[in-house]
Amino acid sequence: MTILPSPQQLRYLVALAETRHFGRAAQACTVTQSTLSAGLLALERQLDCHILDRGAGRHVVFTPLGLELVERARTALSTLEAVTEAAMAAREPMAGPLRLGVIPTIGPFLLPTLMPALREAFPRLRLYLREDTTANLVDRLTASRLDLLLLATPCDCGGADTVPVARDMFLIALPPSHRLVGEEQIPVSALATERLLLLEDGHCLRDQALAVCGLLAGDRGDQDGFAATSLHTLVQMVASGLGITLLPRLAVAAGITKGTGLVLRPLAGPGAWRTLGLAWRPNAPRSADYRALGTHLVDTCREALEL
């Protein structure tokens, strides 16, 4: 009878692949380094193959077969987790752990409203949060390292199922002495000669802002090397007279421009918004929970977007 690898051995394997360090992998699995090393050695003996290149010195190097086994281990662990999730969802909806990924242009502005609302509505739900860029979060969702994402679309969601929860309008942020301050609404055409300050590459808000302005990624932004890693930095750059920027209403409602003296104006014309929504893996066992959470988020987002 063939002896199958244990789930714990597969976790050791995946953890080592993700950290490329025995100590950090052991810490991630909450075991000692010797326990993890022994487990992986036993796995190699069971499978009668070399997973690691032992001739690489102190570096962790996987053999080609080892890399293939890592991907198969991820798939197997994801399937096992789905079995547990399906049973949990049937037994008690909206309970237990939920790994939520959120992008930096949403998290700081929505979570202060969202977290208390979720604790009150779903007291047995345990949220584990990770903030990162859209691409990194989608990769983690695909690899089953996250369960649910809170994103802004349009963006590449990697084929995930999605549900919209709110429309987040864009506002133009201007220094108080800017020539456009007197306008009630600002046409997109008026931005053609302006220095439009944007977040750096990797942030979906950058691409969304360019799309609203009808620009391509290579056309504008980062003039003279100016770029920001956060909306708070963008606000300070505009307040210093370096240019103008687009801010989502969610951030403005949370007070991001408070005390800066910046003037905010809506853009004229259609399409000047992003859509906030949830995303999860297709056929996820807890899909019904995620849709229910999306319905709950509609009211929460409406409250957070009030100016």
Predicted stretch roles:
Residues 1-35, 39, 67-69, 80, ...:
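N-terminal short secondary-structure element
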Residues 44-64:
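A short LG(V/I)-centered, amphipathic sequence patch enriched
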Residues 110, 176, 242, 262-307:
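A late-sequence structural motif
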Residues 133-146, 151-152, 202-263:
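Hydrophobic hinge/microswitch elements
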Residues 157-164, 168, 183, 190, ...:
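Beta-alpha-beta core module
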Residues 195-217, 286-296, 301-307:
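Secondary-structure junction motif
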